[in-house]
Design a protein with these regions (language model features):
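Local beta-strand N-terminus motif with an aromatic residue
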Residues: 2-3
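A conserved beta-strand element that flanks and buttresses the S-adenosyl-L-methionine
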Residues: 6-7
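Hydrophobic adenine-recognition pocket in adenosine-nucleotide-binding enzymes
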Residues: 11
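A short, conserved alpha-helix within the catalytic core of class I
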Residues: 14-30
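Conserved beta-strand signature within the Rossmann-like core of class I S-adenosyl-L-methionine
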Residues: 26-48
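Short secondary-structure boundary/capping segments
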Residues: 52-58
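Short alpha-helix
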Residues: 58-76
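Core SAM-dependent methyltransferase catalytic element
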Residues: 79-97
Length: 97
């Protein structure tokens, strides 16, 4: 049984930065779970991401908003994108292709 919607808030940066999981694998992992996805992108400039990076080498040049959009757009239609105040974070509503 699949869910109607997956809510992935404050998740991607942990998987990508702390877990070294590439964005394409994250998108592929989430895609079969539900028709719709609400997902948050947390930029490298965010304090939480800086904490994840403080004790490791920054090898995450591909972890950008532009790459995130491009990679997820290959698996989803981006229905809505909303900047979260002045945080640099973005929320996306997506529909599986």
């Amino acid at each position: 049984m699949k869910a109607d919607l997956v809510l992935a808030l404050a998740l991607v940066h942990h998987l990508a930065i702390a877990g070294n999981i590439p964005l394409p694998l994250i998108a592929a992992w989430l895609q079969p779970m539900a028709e719709h996805l609400v997902i948050e992108f947390v930029p490298r400039s965010d304090e939480k991401v800086k904490l994840l990076l403080q004790n490791r080498r920054d090898i995450f040049d591909g972890y950008t908003l532009e790459n995130f959009r491009s990679i997820f757009a290959a698996k989803y239609t981006i229905v809505k994108e909303e900047k979260v105040g002045n945080t640099g974070r973005f929320l996306f509503l997506m529909k599986r292709n």
